[in-house]
């Protein structure tokens, strides 16, 4: 299962140097092609999306992503969020398509795992700590209760873990739990992220890392507003 940056590595190995924007565009193009060549009814059913067929013969996929209804027009592959005129970030388009392309539709296991327990998670962990955990600590370490308010914008709900914790359904089959422990004179604030073990059947570890980073930044933005 290719992640957001994997395509660039393949191109560089072939002697083609890509800019970050090139990398994302290649990944986006490949993900679009894969979805168009798939059984759309099956992909929609497994991912928890809705496939609508228009009178014109064109189709529309609707998928919940971070508490928003996102739409994909087929076969043009135009993507956007319902009720918003803002251009969807390319990283969001890629994550949505990767989820649609790879979700196996398994029921949640109820077994929580840490980032390090994901395939190759130990290798990605330094980036995860820098881009997800540290921003959460900086934004909410002194006031963990604010995390609960920030998460409401993303459809999050409070859970009884740590000093404050929230579970956010990034996608229909992808709950992510963010946990904070408040610091004191002896200990620094800490943060952790837990996933249902079935996340490996929906997204690559690289995609999970990017997804967590973006959720953390959205909540941090709320805290700074």
Where in this protein do the model-derived segments appear?
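Short Lys/Arg-enriched alpha/beta "domain-start" segment
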Residues: 2-59, 92, 99-154
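Domain-length accessory/inserted modules outside core catalytic folds
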Residues: 121-133, 161-162, 200-204, 211, ...
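Short, well-ordered helical secondary-structure segments
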Residues: 83, 87, 123, 127-129, ...
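Ampiphathic alpha-helical segments that act as solvent-exposed interaction surfaces
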Residues: 1-2, 85-109, 196-225
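Intrinsically disordered, low-complexity regulatory segments enriched in Ser/Thr/Pro
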Residues: 68-94, 181-206
